[in-house]
Amino acid sequence: TLAALLSCAMVVSMTACDGSKPAGTTAASATPETTAAERVEETTAAEAASGDMGDELHFKLAENQADGNPITEGMKMFADLANKYTDGTVNIDVYPNAALCDEASSIDQVMAGTLDFSRVNTNSMAPVVDLFGAFSMPYLFSNTEAKYKALDGAAGEMAFKELENYNMVGLDFYEAGSRNFYTTDKPITCVADLKGMKIRVQQTEVAISMVQALGAEATPMDYGEVFQGLQTGIVDGAENDFVSYYTSGHYEVAKNFTL
């Protein structure tokens, strides 16, 4: 089936650091600076040791998936647990359905320090750190065990380490499911069926190159515009995981789903 040609979609949560600029090319100082992650850990540890987390803290988390999507529900659970384990000090408001901004904008805002948290696809992170794009390549992992071994190991650590140069801290990788094709009129039964079809993709080199290699016309489009794009015929189909296909209502206008 076509699913063997596709990658597993992985997503990563981010949080802004202290507002410092990206690392430059000047020589390092005599006393090495602590990393953003170390600063966060040291501050949290000191507060926990004193038993006083201070005044209430309020943060915003951007999520492009709709309410009811397991990813969105996971972000809400993250917010609930953060509030619980800090005795009500940390309050994170989750904004689903791209209510604050799209994924690309959320990354820019986290880097600028104007947004606190964002849950984004690794494909969307590729323009900032190339290694994230590699995680979305087809056939990269032979099985789920190999995937998590890489992401929880050196590869994932390298990617998160690079984020610190852009004023961000990676929290964790999050499973979103395998990506599949779905179309409005012509069903896809083999790779040849993709020839000439306009398929919505994310605005990333990996996604565009993959769809073009399969013979289709890659059409970058913001996630929030996909439903209308399918409905009006701007695109013939799209590629995403099944849960997003369902919770975003894309099944209403794209009846053909190829696993």
Predicted feature locations:
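A gly/proline- and charged-residue-enriched helix-loop-helix capping module
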Residues: 145-160
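Short, low-complexity disordered leader/linker segments with a strong preference
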Residues: 1-58
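N-terminal secretory/targeting leader peptides
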Residues: 18-23, 40, 48-145, 163-259
